[in-house]
Curated annotation (Swiss-Prot):
Interacts with SED5. Sequence repeats lie at residues 106-142, 220-257, 436-474, 478-514. It comes from Saccharomyces cerevisiae (strain ATCC 204508 / S288c) (Baker's yeast). This is Protein SLY1. GO terms for molecular function: SNARE binding; syntaxin binding. Present with 5780 molecules/cell in log phase SD medium. One of its GO terms (biological process) is retrograde vesicle-mediated transport, Golgi to endoplasmic reticulum. Belongs to the STXBP/unc-18/SEC1 family. It is a peripheral membrane protein. The lineage of its organism: Eukaryota, Fungi, Dikarya, Ascomycota, Saccharomycotina. Transmembrane segments: none annotated. Residues 106-514 are annotated as: 4 X approximate repeats. Pfam families: Sec1. The gene is SLY1. Able to suppress the functional loss of YPT1. SLY1 is essential for cell viability. May interact indirectly, or directly with YPT1.
């Protein structure tokens, strides 16, 4: 199956599409034939084709792209024996071909030409992460011709892979502080135009990897509209320059097959950036550092009495979430209590399998078995073959056990469950009273969490919060000498923001399926048993009534927009009225006006992009909607300029609040 065919299959994820494109490049841009699941593609190629051993040369950006989806063993199966950074001192390997996968910069081109001059490798296969500008292409051609060694350059390709994929349908352009840049009064028009062009370039890469030219819908009046226009122009030029009769990229005129790209500004839903989620993946991202599938957990922190949220830990422990991590795939989207219950079940299953092995082999511990043993007993040989898989399973379970233990420690020390609880009912008097009680808990290691919850209450309360309540909260933070510049921006945003998110109508995702939240009897005392004593002290009283913390599943603003655009027949009138005003661009219309008043039509596939920062809460809510039984299953890919932690986004709007204050003072 060719890579283009793989990319067109509905059941293939965005991550799979990127992997297939990378593997095609590693096999010197030859079409790959593979009929199995794409996760086994390297094994199949390794067995079916004669491997050409190669060197892979990367830069910082391309390293991030590859390391998010492939491991060293995968590279080895693709014939990569050595991989190095382009700026490192590299030993000459004159008998070995080299694949370059680097950003299209003048500096990288100069290094490649120097490698060519010195005959560092036998052949040069040059691949750029995104489109090489014409002036740099001409520069490369001129420099190569001067060397007289152009015969060594076998390929020059634009790969359109300049984006990071960390989950099956989640991607990031790795552009930090985009919201700050786009909303800071000090930012020049030239800087905004340049940033929007960079974002459009990143989306262009993603669209070409998906291998289908989508309809573009975008919110008007902000950066999303600018980016949509720029991207529409780039895609239209691409369509014009491509022979549609011979390129699968342009196949599929049916809207159900083509899909839709929905570009939104972050202001559509500010609260989701600060919400305390009860979903396992969201909690790991929020509480610890989850970056490119690596979880970084602080091992030591200062005593209670200081806010550790920004302090550097004395030591950290890192855990890799492998792309084939079975527990993460099955549980990352579940509420924390359910995931905790499942890790215990996984451990018990492993223990049963290990006990069966020891019974069959007669050893007391499976670690006593030698995988290289030549024991003639057929039964033992069969058991030994299972050892690597079983060992890997145990390592995965241990990883998540350790993560759960660390999460529990943070839950207890910061009373994080209380913030999740108050955010469920932002408008009630009881919630406000409860929040004031939380402020009096005597803890100062959770000041950031308190500020986040207040922002959520302020933005999501439909009638607004009483002035005396707001004043009490502000006084609390001032008494604790905590920076509340962020609130200045939040107040301004609430005052001036369009009511687009307020006019969107939520939809329940409860559908009677197994995916719906169920009441759980699992308390923290039960979860504590899973950690095998790694936590000190009793924590059973922390969330004894766990089922009250499992709210009804419902859509959030971004999902309401996607629902209205992808499934208009089943969407509310309120949501349809909001999205009807969105920009509509069809890049395939190359003559006349390419923008027109949109007609309501259904789509099975979408790419949803948020300008100014995204989060795992929106990703999970969209996936839950896509796979709910409210409609036929949909494919929804979600991305942003950057997947941003609450702490990082709080810092951005704090700087905006301070900047606006200084401008007002001036």
């Amino acid at each position: 199956m060719a890579v283009e065919e793989i990319a067109s299959r509905k059941d293939i994820s965005l991550r799979d599409m990127q992997i297939s494109a990378i593997l095609k490049m590693l096999f010197l841009n030859k079409d790959l034939n593979n009929n199995d699941n794409i996760t086994t593609i390297t094994d199949d190629i390794f067995n079916q084709q004669e491997i050409i051993w190669k060197v892979l040369i990367l830069d910082i950006k391309s390293t991030a792209t590859i390391s998010s989806v492939l491991r060293v063993n995968d590279l080895l199966k693709a014939g990569i024996t050595v991989h190095s950074l382009i700026k490192q001192d590299r030993s000459p390997l004159p008998d070995v071909p080299a694949i370059y996968f680097v950003s299209p910069t003048k500096e990288n081109i100069d290094i490649i030409v120097n490698d060519l001059k010195s005959d560092k490798y036998s052949e040069f296969y040059i691949n750029f992460t995104s489109s090489l500008p014409r002036n740099l292409l001409e520069d490369l051609a001129q420099q190569v011709s001067i060397t007289g060694k152009s015969d060594k350059i076998k390929q020059v390709y634009d790969q359109y892979l300049d984006f990071i994929v960390t989950e099956p349908e989640l991607f990031s352009l790795e552009i930090s502080n985009a919201y700050l840049t786009l909303n800071d009064p000090k930012t020049t028009e030239e800087e905004i135009t340049g940033l929007c062009a960079n974002i459009a370039d990143g989306l262009f890469n993603t669209v070409l990897t998906i291998n289908s030219i989508p309809i573009i819908r975008a919110a008007k009046g902000g950066p999303a509209e600018i980016i949509a226009e720029k991207l529409g122009t780039k895609l239209r030029d691409f369509v014009i320059n491509t022979n549609s009769s011979s390129t699968s990229t342009l196949q599929g005129n049916d809207s159900l097959e083509r899909g839709v790209l929905i570009i939104l500004d972050r202001n559509i839903d500010f609260a989701s950036m600060f919400s305390h989620s009860w979903i396992y993946q969201c909690m790991v991202f929020d509480i610890f550092k989850l970056s490119r599938n690596t979880v970084t957990i602080p091992l030591e922190s200062k005593e209670n009495g200081t806010d550790n949220t920004t302090a550097k830990p004395l030591a950290t422990k890192k855990y890799d979430i492998e792309p084939n991590d079975f527990f993460w795939m099955e549980n990352s989207h579940l509420p924390f209590p359910e995931a905790a219950e499942n890790v215990e079940a996984a451990l018990n299953t492993y223990k049963e399998e290990a006990a069966e092995i020891t019974r069959k082999t007669g050893v007391t511990n499976i670690s006593d078995l030698d995988p290289n043993s030549n024991n003639d007993t057929v039964q033992i040989q069969e058991v030994v073959k299972k050892l690597p898989e079983l060992t890997a399973k145990k390592n995965t379970i241990d990883t998540h056990m350790n993560i759960f233990a660390a999460l529990l420690s943070q839950l207890e020390s910061k009373s994080l469950d209380t913030f999740f609880e108050v955010e469920q009912d932002p408008g009630s008097t009881k919630t406000r009273s409860r929040f004031l009680d939380i402020l009096k808990d005597g803890k100062t290691n959770n000041l950031e969490d308190k500020l986040r919850s207040f922002i959520v209450l302020y933005l999501t309360s439909t009638t607004g919060l009483p002035k005396d309540f707001v004043q009490n909260v502000e006084n609390y933070f001032k008494e604790n000498d905590y920076d509340i510049n962020a609130l200045k921006y939040v107040y301004k945003l609430r005052e001036f923001m369009q009511l687009s998110n307020m006019s969107l109508q939520n939809k329940s995702l409860e559908d009677g399926s197994d995916s719906a939240f169920k009441p759980s009897n699992l308390t923290l005392s039960g979860i504590y048993g899973l950690t095998e004593g790694k936590l000190q002290g009793g924590v059973g009283s922390l969330i004894s009534g766990i089922k009250k913390l499992l709210p009804e599943k419902k859509t959030i603003p971004i999902t309401n927009v996607v629902d209205a655009i992808m499934d208009p027949l089943n969407s509310s009138q309120k949501n349809l009225e909001t999205t009807d005003s969105y920009l509509y661009i069809d890049p395939k219309i190359t003559r006349g006006s390419h923008t027109r008043k949109p007609k309501r039509q259904s789509y099975n596939k979408s790419l949803v992009f948020v300008v100014g920062g995204g989060n795992y809460l929106e990703y999970q809510n969209l996936q839950e909607w896509a796979h709910s039984q409210l409609h036929n299953p949909k494919k929804v890919m979600y991305g942003s300029t950057a997947i941003t932690t609450p702490a990082e986004f709080l810092n951005e709007i704090s700087r905006l609040g301070a900047s606006n204050s200084s401008n007002n003072d001036a």
